Amino acid sequence: MSEIFRPPVSRIATLAGHRDAVYALTGGAGSTIYSGSADGMVVGWDAAEPSRDGELLARVENSVYALKYLPALHMLVLGHNFQGIQAIDLAGRQLAHATALPPVAIFDIVYSESRQRLYAGLGDGTLAVLTVPDFRLEKLLRLADKSLRCLALHEGRGELAVGSSDALTRILDLDSLETRFTLGESTNSVFSVVYSGDGTRLLTAGRDAQIRSWDVATGYGLVDTVPAHMYTINHLAFSPDGRYLASCSLDKSIKLWDAATLTLLRVLDRTRAAGHGTSVNRLVWPGTENRLVSCSDDRSLAVWQLEV
C-alpha cells in the first residue's frame, strides 16, 4: 500500500488593511484576488507578490458577502448587502453598473458564460437573475423560506446548485429554473456547494460540520459523508489541478483533503500552522503557484504555500 503524500503547507504572508471581518474572496486574472468585508471595503491583492499593498477598489455603505470576477468583461461584481449588485470596470477603476435588489443580504454570486446570466442568492430565499452585460434584473424567483447561502454552476449539464438555510440543496435547470433534484441529507444550513473540476461530483457542507459527496451522474446520489470539522464549515474550494480540496470553518481551522478520497492531509490552525485566531470564512486558489488564500473574522487574509 502506497504511503499518502501530505504536502507541507506554510503561511507565507498576511494581507492586512480591512477594518472588520472579511467575508468575501474571489480570484481574478492571474494571481490577483479580491476581498470584501463587513466594513464595506473591496480590495484587490496580488497573491504572487503578497508584500505589495492592497488596492482599494470600492467602499460601500453596507457589508459585502459576495464577489465575482467576470474575465470576459474584466469586471468585478459585488453584492452590496441591502442595496443590490454593483459592477466595477477594473480597467477604468470605476462603477459601471448598479442594479437594485430587495433590501436583504446577498450571500453568493455566480456567472454563467453560456447563458450570459448572473445569479445571486439572497437572504429572503430568493434567487435573482440578471442579464449580462447590461446587468438588468430579469427575474426574482422565491425558492425557500430561508436564506440562499451558496451557489455552484455545472455548465455542462446546465444546472445550478443552490444551498440554503432550510438544510436543502436544490439542483435547478439553468434555463427553466425548475428544480430537478432536492438533496435533503444535511441536518442544518448549507453554506457551501462546489462541483469537482471534472463535473462528476458535487460537494456540500455547512452548519452540521460534515462534507457530503454526491454522484452527479446517478441523479445526485449520496456517496460519502465525512465528519470534517468541530463547528460550521463556511466554505469548500478545489485546487485548480483538482488534486486537493480545502475547507474552512468556524472552528478557526483550514483543512486540506485529498480531493478524490476525502482523506485528511493537513490541518492549518493557530497551534500547528500559525493560522487564524477566529472563524475562517472563505478560500480561494489564485494563479498556478499552489497557493491558497483564506480570510477571517480577524480582519486579515492569509497566504498559504503548498510544497507539491
Where do the PLM segments sit?
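Blade-level signature of beta-propeller repeat domains, shared across WD40, Kelch, NHL, RCC1
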Residues: 279-308
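Residue-level detector of Asp-centered blade-edge/turn motifs that repeat once per structural unit
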Residues: 28-30, 71-72, 113-114, 155-156, ...
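Conserved strand-to-loop turn within each blade of WD40 beta-propeller repeats
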Residues: 36-39, 79-82, 121-124, 163-166, ...
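WD40/WD-repeat beta-propeller blade N-cap
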Residues: 15-22, 57-64, 99-106, 141-148, ...
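Short loop/turn segments that connect beta-strands within beta-propeller blades
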Residues: 47-50, 89-93, 131-135, 174-177, ...
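WD40-repeat beta-propellers
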Residues: 42-46, 86-88, 127-130, 169-172, ...
